[in-house]
Amino acid sequence: MSTNDIGLVGLAVMGQNLALNIADHGYTIAVYNRSPEKTTEFMAHCAAHEPAHERLTGFADIGEFVKSIKRPRKIILLVKAGAATDATIAALLPHLEADDIIID
């Protein structure tokens, strides 16, 4: 079921802070990182310290991450430029539809 307003890929410092900012402004947000342990750590930190943690949902599977976002999907990429960005887009594409948006 698609319940999240927006998705964010990349949970380094900028990704974490942007995800929290979006959640703090009342939007539901799905988060994904290619290293599942990074997502797990971020979600555990949020549950313990962030009032808006209920608007954040972490995913270890990129397909489930995409499915959780309302159509047309809006996905923000905050990953290293170059090969990492290309690999992330390649992993997302099989799960996206024509009207979905990737913001890089």
Question: Model segments located where?
Answer:
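NAD(P)+-binding Rossmann beta1-loop-alpha1 motif at the extreme N-terminus of oxidoreductases
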Residues: M1-I76, A91-D104
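Short glycine-/small-residue-rich Rossmann-like dinucleotide-binding loops
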Residues: V79-A81
